[in-house]
């Protein structure tokens, strides 16, 4: 298993109280495959550097996970299929 940092930018029209419960359904993919969700950091609504899908703001969420590469690919695929997710970025962190 490798450590990853996943940044997700969500639609700003979502209620911020529903962000964590809706992310849990996606994070269950990691847990089901034997991975570990180490941290979920919800930054809240921030201004975007440029418009994405006609939105100037987005709700930023940073997730630290330890999982297999195939599991992270599946998580990224499922997030990108969700209409409320504007953008995702997956980075492998090399914490020794």
From Swiss-Prot:
Entries under InterPro entries matching the protein: Ribosomal_bS6 (IPR000529), Ribosomal_bS6_CS (IPR020815), Ribosomal_bS6_sf (IPR035980), Ribosomal_S6_plastid/chlpt (IPR020814), Transl_elong_EF1B/ribsomal_bS6 (IPR014717)
Keyword Ribonucleoprotein annotated: yes
Residues in the signal sequence: none
Pfam families linked to this entry: Ribosomal_S6 (PF01250)
Domain of life: Bacteria
PROSITE patterns, A to Z: RIBOSOMAL_S6
GO cellular component: cytoplasm; peptidoglycan-based cell wall; plasma membrane; ribonucleoprotein complex; ribosome
GO function terms (MF aspect): small ribosomal subunit rRNA binding; structural constituent of ribosome
GO biological process: translation
Record key words, sorted: Ribonucleoprotein, Ribosomal protein, RNA-binding, rRNA-binding
Function per UniProt: Binds together with bS18 to 16S ribosomal RNA.
Membership in a protein family: Belongs to the bacterial ribosomal protein bS6 family.
Protein name in UniProt: Small ribosomal subunit protein bS6
């Amino acid at each position: 298993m490798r450590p990853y940092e996943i940044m997700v930018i969500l639609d700003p029209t979502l209620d911020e109280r529903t962000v964590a419960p809706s992310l849990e359904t996606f994070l269950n993919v990691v847990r089901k495959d034997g991975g570990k969700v180490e941290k979920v950091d919800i930054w809240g609504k921030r201004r975007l550097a440029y418009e994405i899908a006609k939105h100037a703001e987005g709700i930023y969420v940073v997730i630290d996970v330890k999982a297999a590469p195939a599991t992270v690919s599946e998580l990224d695929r499922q997030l990108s299929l969700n209409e409320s997710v504007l953008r995702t970025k997956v980075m492998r962190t090399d914490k020794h």
